[in-house]
Amino acid sequence: MNLDSSASALSYQSGFGNEFASEALPGALPVGQNSPQKAPYGLYAELFSGTAFTMTRSEARRTWMYRIQPSAKHPAFAKLARQLAGGPLGEVTPNRLRWSPLQIPSEPTDFIDGLVAMVANSAAQKPAGISVYHYRANRSMERVFFNADGELLLVPELGRLRIVTELGMLDLEPLEIAVLPRGLKFRIELLDPQARGYVAENHGAPLRLPDLGPIGSNGLANPRDFLAPVAHYEDLRQPTTLVQKYLGELWGCELDHSPLNVVAWHGNNVPYKYDLRRFNTIGTVSFDHPDPSIFTVLTSPTSVPGLANLDFVIFPPRWMVAENTFRPPWFHRNLMNEFMGLIQGAYDAKAEGFLPGGASLHSCMSAHGPDGETCTKAINAQLQPAKIDNTMAFMFETSQVLRPSQFALECPELQNDYDACWASLPVTFNPNRR
């Protein structure tokens, strides 16, 4: 049986961190055990582990797959001649950096070839840290890919995607995100002529929902709004290239079948998507600007309580009602390191220069805040309830310093005049007037 991945309507399972179960053929899931002597339909049982066996049950992530051919059936991998764009990490710089949107190549480019390394804070073999990429594509993948180096968080800015994975399919559009577990095989098909966006590669603990503390049991990203796929398989006996990223390098081998051949599965180590428009935004209804941690969608913790390996934070449409308050994000010097992107609209701390598809980097203790134009307007504004609308900025925040790639420091999209946006900040100090 070969299910057509071009079908328009997809079904999903709802919830975050659930023990899901799905089968594309009735009775394909074994009952009462994981690895029977003879699995239904002559399938192979295969365990897909996302954490160590001895993790606490609340932290453990694993999925049992029942597939036509096991993943072990492949020849040796060979290092590919064409590696990821971006080059090695560049020189260390404490400077604030901002990039205009990267151009989409004119030559045929799939998701893998369109990945460009921008910043990173650790080598891929370390069990912590993140790497950040841009992706640009103008054709669907014919290859299948998996990433041995970390979990992938995809943030589209332009163009719809269909992500065909071992466990089923996810359709993704701008203002939605997808998370793909480390090692999951997938193929990305374009549903529009071009696609562009951002990828955070999480080398640390898997992403999860942040604790809500005094907010209570509801708010921010609600678990029911996360969607996991249902089983879908390809029974294709044709040459297929399988590519993996291993310690930052691309390796490939040739199969005689599609590796997206899982007929049934159960577990919690699964891909999922989330619509950012469903985020329940929290904010002040009195005065001052709360810390931006109230906008956290997902977090990857470290061993230090409250210190994130990766926080994924958004700045969505919201009402601003604070009285006697400087309403834009305040001026800041941060222990954490902030890589920001923009999906649509404008960011309320920058009047111009920060464009959809662009990015900025403010490293540890790099002073930042609203630009001169935004600051002047905010100081003199008549404070009435106002809605920030038609916007979606986001931030990958991490506790380790992010180093730009050589490409990021040399590309023409780097805005060499970024510091000038603060040059027009007025001096309003007057010792004779309080």
UniProtKB/Swiss-Prot annotation:
GO terms for cellular component: cytoplasm. The active site is at H289 (proton acceptor). Pfam families: HgmA_C (PF04209), HgmA_N (PF20510). Keywords: Dioxygenase, Iron, Metal-binding, Oxidoreductase, Phenylalanine catabolism, Tyrosine catabolism. GO terms for molecular function: homogentisate 1,2-dioxygenase activity; iron ion binding. GO terms for biological process: L-phenylalanine catabolic process; tyrosine catabolic process. Transmembrane segments: none annotated. It comes from the Bacteria. CDD domains: cupin_HGO_N. Homogentisate binds at Y347, H368. It catalyses: homogentisate + O2 = 4-maleylacetoacetate + H(+). Its EC number is 1.13.11.5. Its cofactor is Fe cation. The keyword Iron applies. InterPro entries: HgmA_C, HgmA_N, Homogentis_dOase, Homogentis_dOase_bac, RmlC-like_jellyroll, RmlC_Cupin_sf. NCBIfam families: hmgA. Belongs to the homogentisate dioxygenase family. Involved in the catabolism of homogentisate (2,5-dihydroxyphenylacetate or 2,5-OH-PhAc), a central intermediate in the degradation of phenylalanine and tyrosine. Catalyzes the oxidative ring cleavage of the aromatic ring of homogentisate to yield maleylacetoacetate. Hexamer; dimer of trimers. This is Homogentisate 1,2-dioxygenase. It comes from Pseudomonas fluorescens (strain ATCC BAA-477 / NRRL B-23932 / Pf-5). The lineage of its organism: Bacteria, Pseudomonadati, Pseudomonadota, Gammaproteobacteria, Pseudomonadales.
